[in-house]
Amino acid sequence: MSKYMGGKEASSVLGVHQRTLYQWDKKGWIKTIRTKGGKRLYDVGSYLADKDEESKEDHKLSICYVRVSSNSQKDDLERQIKFMKKKYPNHTIIKDISSGINMNRKGLNKIIDLAIEGRIKEVVVAYKDRLAIFGFSLIERLIETYSDGKIVVVRKKENQEPQEELIEDMMDVMNVFTARRNGSRKYSNK
């Protein structure tokens, strides 16, 4: 949408002085055209559309997501939080204490809700499995599609073959089910 206006009208619409418009033109902040007589016409429509896009971006959140599996790992959770705050001081921290297989986590649900609302700029995780052992690519797609955001994995496992990744996923699943079985056995023996 481009709507060109003279200096007086443009300054009235934008709420700035005509000299300010002239400075913005010199800096390239607003598009202008010149009439044959040399009068400047300002593209107020495009300027307002650009500002609207910028304000939408300003409302998007940058999030650091941290997670541990159990309350006994709270020390690790605190280390993750400390690391993320140091490396990403302007990000919001969202934390969970729950299994990576459990997709019904309070923090994860909040991230999904924010993504669907289009309010996520980026989500930073230490490792992919901190966000989700299974379904990482689904969450990534939600964030990309609805929020035009991204997931940043800080510590990637370099040059991992697909077979190695599959074996690692299977080991994660086995560990979770073993821990659940041993945990339930522990309580039944009491």
Swiss-Prot record:
| The entry's DNA-binding region | 11-30
Matching Pfam families, A to Z?
MerR (PF00376), Resolvase (PF00239)
Q: Which residues form the active site?
A: S69 (o-(5'-phospho-dna)-serine intermediate)
**Family annotation (InterPro entries):** DNA-bd_dom_put_sf (IPR009061), MerR-type_HTH_dom (IPR000551), Recombinase/Transposase-rel (IPR051491), Recombinase_CS (IPR006118), Resolv_N (IPR006119), Resolvase-like_N_sf (IPR036162), Transpos_IS607 (IPR048046)
Q: What are the record keywords, sorted? A: Coiled coil, DNA integration, DNA recombination, DNA-binding
Q: Which residues form a coiled coil?
A: 67-92
Query: Can you name one GO molecular function term for this protein?
Result: DNA strand exchange activity
Q: Which GO terms describe its biological process?
A: DNA integration; regulation of DNA-templated transcription
Name all Resolvase/invertase-type recombinase catalytic domain ranges. Answer: 61-190
So what family is this one in? Belongs to the site-specific recombinase resolvase family.
The job of this chain, per UniProt, is described as: Resolvase catalyzes the resolution (a site-specific recombination) of the cointegrated replicon to yield the final transposition products.
Q: What is this protein called?
A: Putative resolvase R80
